[in-house]
Structures are given as structure tokens and as C-alpha cells.
């Protein structure tokens, strides 16, 4: 894989022994071996997934070819019934779109006035006197119901705080 010969591997081992020492070298070798093992398993997993995806794609392509071939070799009666089913499905779609309650509620909440892009067009036909009349017209206040007034009870006496004992009360 890396095209490393025995002499190069021996040189790396000796350098590692000098740098890490005899106590830490086995731990470092185990760690590096674990990394290499993890990378190999990852590469194998990716390769297997790609192979499965390619097989699945080939299967789907062949299935589409078979479907096209079977549609062209259908009897005229089956073709006629398929056309009738398609027409029925299209008419159902059209009737659903026409009677869509969600669309009707959306239409009810839609503002149909076009957006005015030009400021002069928006104020066309409005004179200062008309604007003053609109501005000075009384506002309509919403009707309010009178709220009931709560009266305090006559027999209820206001509570007073009890006097706290002071230092002069003590003997």
C-alpha cells in the first residue's frame, strides 16, 4: 500500500525507539495500528455502500426498461382501460382543485388591490380639503358594556396591625 521496504520500516522503528523510548513505543505502535484499522474499515464501508448504490441504480434502470417494454406490448383493451383511468384521475384532480376549501379560505384572506408603485398615482384626485375632511371625521369607538361596580361590604372593618412590643414595655 505505501510501498515501504523492510529497511525503511526498520529505520522508522529505530527513530521511534530513540524519540519515544522503550516504554512509550509499544503504546504509540498500538495507537497507530488502531488508526490504520479504523481507516481501512471506513474505506471498506464506503466501498460497500457505493457498490450497493450502483447495483440499486442498475436495477432501477432495468426495471424502467421492462416497464417501457411492457407498456408498448399491451393489448388494445388494456391500453383503453389505462387511458380511461388516466382521464378519470385528471378529472378528479380538476374537480378537487376547483372545490379546494383551503384555496377558498386563502382567497377570502387575500387583498386584491394592486400595489401602487407611484406616489403621485396613489394621491391622485385627493385634494387638501378632502384629506382634511377625512382626517377630522370623528373616530368610531367600539361599544362597551358598563362594568359592574364592586361595593365594599359595610360590616367589614379595616384591619389594623397589632402594636409591636417595644423595649420600654419590658421590666
From Swiss-Prot:
Residues 100-123 have a biased composition (Basic and acidic residues). GO terms for cellular component: TAT protein transport complex. It is a single-pass membrane protein. Its main location: membrane. Signal peptide: none annotated. Keywords: Cell inner membrane, Cell membrane, Membrane, Protein transport, Translocation, Transmembrane, Transmembrane helix, Transport. Residues 89-171 are annotated as: Disordered. It is found in: Cell inner membrane. The chain crosses the membrane at residues 1-21. Residues 130-139 have a biased composition (Polar residues). One of its GO terms (biological process) is protein transport by the Tat complex. The keyword Transmembrane helix applies. One of its GO terms (molecular function) is protein transmembrane transporter activity. InterPro entries: TatB. It comes from the Bacteria. NCBIfam families: tatB. The Tat system comprises two distinct complexes: a TatABC complex, containing multiple copies of TatA, TatB and TatC subunits, and a separate TatA complex, containing only TatA subunits. Substrates initially bind to the TatABC complex, which probably triggers association of the separate TatA complex to form the active translocon. Belongs to the TatB family. Part of the twin-arginine translocation (Tat) system that transports large folded proteins containing a characteristic twin-arginine motif in their signal peptide across membranes. Together with TatC, TatB is part of a receptor directly interacting with Tat signal peptides. TatB may form an oligomeric binding site that transiently accommodates folded Tat precursor proteins before their translocation. HAMAP family: TatB (MF_00237). This is Sec-independent protein translocase protein TatB. The gene is tatB.
Amino acid at each position: 500500500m505505501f510501498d515501504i521496504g523492510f529497511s525503511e520500516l526498520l529505520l522508522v522503528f529505530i527513530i521511534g525507539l530513540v524519540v519515544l523510548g522503550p516504554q512509550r513505543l509499544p503504546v504509540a505502535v498500538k495507537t497507530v495500528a488502531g488508526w490504520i484499522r479504523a481507516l481501512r474499515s471506513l474505506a471498506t464501508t464506503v466501498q460497500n455502500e457505493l457498490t450497493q448504490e450502483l447495483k440499486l441504480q442498475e436495477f432501477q434502470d432495468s426495471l424502467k426498461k421492462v416497464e417501457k417494454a411492457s407498456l408498448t406490448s399491451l393489448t388494445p383493451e388494456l391500453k383503453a382501460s389505462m387511458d380511461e383511468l388516466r382521464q378519470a384521475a385528471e378529472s378528479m384532480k380538476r374537480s378537487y382543485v376547483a372545490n379546494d376549501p383551503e384555496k377558498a379560505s386563502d382567497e377570502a384572506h387575500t387583498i386584491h388591490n394592486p400595489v401602487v408603485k407611484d406616489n403621485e398615482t396613489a394621491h391622485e384626485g385627493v385634494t387638501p380639503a378632502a384629506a382634511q375632511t377625512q382626517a377630522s371625521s370623528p373616530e368610531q369607538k367600539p361599544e362597551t358594556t358598563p362594568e359592574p361596580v364592586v361595593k365594599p361590604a359595610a360590616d367589614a372593618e379595616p384591619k389594623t396591625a397589632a402594636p409591636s412590643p417595644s423595649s420600654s414595655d419590658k421590666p
